């Protein structure tokens, strides 16, 4: 959106369209392309965090620090005390360093942030947060659900939007439904709370880029789908005079040679292999 001379845009929304690269701008993404090439839009290249993984990239964006500084060196890590691997942990306290919204609060005490499905979103200092969080029963049963802050937000938003389509967020059935629900949750929060900063995670494109590869013709369908979801959000926020920023965590490219570290480690005799249900585990 183009603001007049001297006119300020006091609020912003950041749409994290995972996997989006400059090469995707074009006929399959007309609305994202229009934003990037509009007077209000300024297209910039970002050197991705290393390693190029969701948790590391997001923590880098939100702290302005490198993984070696904020401590999120991957989507998981090996705990040498417990001798266990820990993946996709949720506590925001794992991210070392001041978060973007905390920095902004030093200048504006009433600054409010909504963090929607960006990771490390439990026990966060963000004012409004929603994140995937299954419920685990005493009988071992697992129920798909979300966690929110404030806690009562979870009941209200599920009442209005329905259950979060968890199977379309992770796993073999991952698809556009989860990004659509997240986009609707961003509208819901904006209409009721008008945060100064909204962080919105839209993962759909990344699914098919990893599932099929970046040059597969089916990527065109994924591009059109996420362009529609993101485009509707762009229109919605611009109509409310909220500045729209679109970014990506990393890009997916073709590889010429595959390396399998665990196979090489096993060949060298560096791994202890355990049989579980007929499968090899470390």
Language model segments and positions:
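Short glycine-enriched, charge-decorated loop/helix-capping segments at active-site entrances
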Residues: 214-219
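His/Asp/Glu-rich, glycine-adjacent segments
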Residues: 65-213
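Structural motif
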Residues: 14-16, 197-201, 245
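Short, structured active-site-proximal loop/turn typified by the sulfatase FGly-forming signature C/S-X-P-X-R
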Residues: 25-69, 112-114
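Secondary-structure boundary elements
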Residues: 105-110, 188-196, 228-243, 271
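Active-site-proximal N-terminal segment of extracellular/periplasmic enzymes that hydrolyze or transfer
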Residues: 1-42
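Acidic, His- and aromatic-enriched active-site or binding-groove loops in soluble protein domains
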Residues: 130-159, 220-228, 262-281
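Secreted, luminal/periplasmic, and some membrane-associated catalytic domains
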Residues: 6-10, 27, 41-47, 53, ...
């Amino acid at each position: 959106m183009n603001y007049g001379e001297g006119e300020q845009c006091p609020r912003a929304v950041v749409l994290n369209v995972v996997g989006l690269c400059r090469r995707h701008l074009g006929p399959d993404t007309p609305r994202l392309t229009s934003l990037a090439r509009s007077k209000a839009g300024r297209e910039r290249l970002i050197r991705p965090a290393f390693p190029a993984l969701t948790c590391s990239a997001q923590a880098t964006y939100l702290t302005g620090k490198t993984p070696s500084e904020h401590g999120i060196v991957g989507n998981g890590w090996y705990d040498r005390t417990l001798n266990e691997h820990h993946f996709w942990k949720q506590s925001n306290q794992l991210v070392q360093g001041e978060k973007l919204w905390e920095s902004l609060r030093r200048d504006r005490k009433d600054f409010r942030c909504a963090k929607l499905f960006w990771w490390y979103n439990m026990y966060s200092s963000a004012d409004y947060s929603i994140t995937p969080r299954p419920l685990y029963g005493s009988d071992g049963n697992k129920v798909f659900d979300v966690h929110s802050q404030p806690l009562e937000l979870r009941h209200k938003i599920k009442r209005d939007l329905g259950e979060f389509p968890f199977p379309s967020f992770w796993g073999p059935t991952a698809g556009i439904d989860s990004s659509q629900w997240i986009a609707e949750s961003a509208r819901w929060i904006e209409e009721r709370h008008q945060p100064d900063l909204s962080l919105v995670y839209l993962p759909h494109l990344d699914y098919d880029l990893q599932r099929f590869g970046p040059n597969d013709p089916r990527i065109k369908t994924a591009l059109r789908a996420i362009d529609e979801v993101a485009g509707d959000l762009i229109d919605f926020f611009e109509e409310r005079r909220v500045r729209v920023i679109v970014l990506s965590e990393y890009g997916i490219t073709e590889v010429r040679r595959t390396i399998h570290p665990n196979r090489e480690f096993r060949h060298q005799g560096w791994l202890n292999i355990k049989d579980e249900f007929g499968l090899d585990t470390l």
